[in-house]
């Protein structure tokens, strides 16, 4: 049974669908997930702890036996899972979404300057993530696999620390985009492109939070 003293990130690791519940009340399970459920709820002030625990325990009870939980994968298999479930889809979405973000800024930016800032923030986020994922695939993940196989990797702790630092910076950019878009709520006058961009940026945020959680709280723990 999930209780108020359980750590937010650990609950999501054990029951991945709990991420949806934490997200719905604005609780960070990603870079800020190393706090108790009680502490996270108190920080939000408007979250009823008992109701939150009830919802989380409902998820625990309906957890499907036999469904894939990445925490049970070994390091090399988990890395393959991360690459196929997150790295490849993110690269594809960046390629497809960027023209719409650019169009939104160009067409509506003159009258809504925050859309220009949104594009600039998105570009920083996109370029940082692309560079980060490529470095993981080419340099960092092979080191983690070598470590799992018993080889000596002298800088393994530095590798992990640097990746976590990158994730924190990524989280800050996501927060900024959410603030610029009023949590991705388009104004009444928003056109179809505007609504499309907000919808897909919100989905991108969800995917990135899941991605970072899996690396910070599952993958890195297996090699630290």
UniProtKB/Swiss-Prot annotation:
InterPro entries: Hemerythrin-like, RIC_family, ScdA, ScdA-like_N_sf. It is found in: Cytoplasm. Pfam families: Hemerythrin, ScdA_N. Belongs to the RIC family. ScdA subfamily. PANTHER family: IRON-SULFUR CLUSTER REPAIR PROTEIN YTFE. Di-iron-containing protein involved in the repair of iron-sulfur clusters damaged by oxidative and nitrosative stress conditions. This is Iron-sulfur cluster repair protein ScdA. It comes from Staphylococcus aureus (strain NCTC 8325 / PS 47). The lineage of its organism: Bacteria, Bacillati, Bacillota, Bacilli, Bacillales.
């Amino acid at each position: 049974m999930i209780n108020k003293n359980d750590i937010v990130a650990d609950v999501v690791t054990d029951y991945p669908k709990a991420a949806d519940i934490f997200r719905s009340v604005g609780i960070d399970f990603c870079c800020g997930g190393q706090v108790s459920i009680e502490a996270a709820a108190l920080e939000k002030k408007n979250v009823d702890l008992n109701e939150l625990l009830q919802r989380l325990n409902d998820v625990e009870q309906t957890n499907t036996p036999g469904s894939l939980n990445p925490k049970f994968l070994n390091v090399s298999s988990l890395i393959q899972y991360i690459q196929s479930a997150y790295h490849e889809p993110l690269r594809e979405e960046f390629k497809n979404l960027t023209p719409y973000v650019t169009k939104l800024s160009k067409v509506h930016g003159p009258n809504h300057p925050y859309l220009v800032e949104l594009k600039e923030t998105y570009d920083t986020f996109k370029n940082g993530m692309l560079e980060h994922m490529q470095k993981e695939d080419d340099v960092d993940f092979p080191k983690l696999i070598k470590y799992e196989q018993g080889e000596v990797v002298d800088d393994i702790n530095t590798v992990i620390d640097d990746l976590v630092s990158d994730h924190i910076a990524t989280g800050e950019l996501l927060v900024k985009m959410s603030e610029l878009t009023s949590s991705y709520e388009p104004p009444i006058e928003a056109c179809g492109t505007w609504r499309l961009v907000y919808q897909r940026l919100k989905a991108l945020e969800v995917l990135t939070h899941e991605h970072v959680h899996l690396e910070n709280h599952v993958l890195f723990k297996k090699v630290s």
